[in-house]
Amino acid sequence: MDLKGLTAVELGKKIQAKEVTVKEAVEACFAQIDKVEKEVNSFVSLQKEAALKRAEEVQKLIDDGTLTGPLAGVPVAIKDNMCTEGVTTTCSSKILSNFVPTFSAEAVLNLEKAGAVVIGKTNMDEFAMGSTTETSYYGETKNPWNLEHVPGGSSGGSCAAVAALEVPYALGSDTGGSIRQPSSYCGIVGIKPTYGTVSRYGLIAYGSSLDQIGPVARDVTDCATVLETIASHDVKDSTSVERQDTDFTSALVNDVKGMKIGIPKDYFGEGLDEEVKKPILEAAEVLKNAGAEIEEFDLGLVKYAIPAYYVIASAEASSNLSRFDGVKYGYRTKDYEELHQMYKKTRSEGFGPEVKRRIMLGSFVLSSGYYDAYYLKALRTKALIKKAFDSAFAKYDMILTPAAPTTAPKLGASLSDPIKMYLGDIYTISVNLAGLPGISIPVGRDAKGLPVGMQLIGDCFQEKKLFQAAYTYECLTEKKWVSMYDKTETAGKGKA
């Protein structure tokens, strides 16, 4: 039986039905990894021995009826900025290359309680700072649809692993689009939940007011199932929200009749590639024909989202990353005579160029002479962006936009031009600033065969509406091309 093309829920059903053992599911993942990993480079580390041992433990719990959930026995990959007890957690940075946490992130623990089997930690942009997964200390990840292109970022390793059929689903984190943009580039489904829905305990912080953990998978059902599993109130995270409506799979209904969907005109103007625009508007037409009410409107403020985001995120990063100094854990330079010299050399040698750039920017905007001019102004802009979304959601159930302005760029195209890389997140950043949920779903491909993703944005705590609309679209289009990539046959070119 070919297991690698199954979704997480499909695989979970076969495990519960005793058609497949957990060990067979894990071995199928590693067999695919052996075939494709050298080219794709999705993983920073693999835990084969531990995963096989865990598979035996989970199998016993399934056999005796203790574990009956949809993800029991299903392999998962974890982005390498989430702590995993006893397993190296690097943030794809030299400075944490030897860091082994003594605890696991709450989201990881929730998956393990549900019977998931962690098979490895995925590659990412260093400290989640980047949009291409090219800033990793462990080398670039490549897009499984075309190995000459980036997978997006910063959760590029998680998304590439799912697209390359190395694992049924994975966890990513999203600070400014780091789940939704690579999901779009890799032709999979990814959701950033409302801020506070998933505990950030054990997530190594980048921008604490913006970071949120979410799943990436091959279809909407998997995403809803995983989010339902990892969402929980956690007293260890002061920003965690206690919700009673996290039964997200109940929203998997093929029906959008009467839903009001707004299309912001300013998201479809200059800068949007025509090969991206066309399939997204066609997808909107599919929802309209199914009974949704589609209307264009002016959202405004989108042009201010990127500058506001990079001021706020960099300011928070400069503070969060000050803890990495070589004293208690992580990399420490060998060549120093005095303590202050050790700090300086450790950080200079341990951080990559993009991380240094953002630390410098953050330190600058927080300095006494510029705090009011930049940081406070960015916070005011953030509040205005939230207000603009509030006005839109008074009229619409959700907002439909592109997930990214283009399909995946070529490797190296953005490294020499940081502004170009930052603009790759222009349609996703405002969602983080406002703390809203957003989902990216595949809707087509461009002339090169690269995937195009559509983003649906909801009001706070309205993930169910997003899942319902996304699931309806998926049903109506029969998922004709989703997960068609098979590396063993196509050598990274994708299928027509």
Where are the regions a protein language model picked out?
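Serine-dependent amide/ester hydrolase catalytic core
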Residues: 13, 301-302, 325-433, 475, ...
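Structural helix-boundary/capping segments
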Residues: 31, 35, 164-170, 175-271, ...
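Short glycine/serine-rich loop/turn segments
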Residues: 71-213, 264-266, 315, 401-419
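Short helix-loop capping/hinge segments that flank enzyme active sites or metal/cofactor-binding pockets
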Residues: 71-91, 250-262, 315-386, 437-451
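Short, conserved phosphate/pyrophosphate- and ester-handling motifs at nucleotide-, phospho-/glycolipid
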Residues: 18, 79, 219
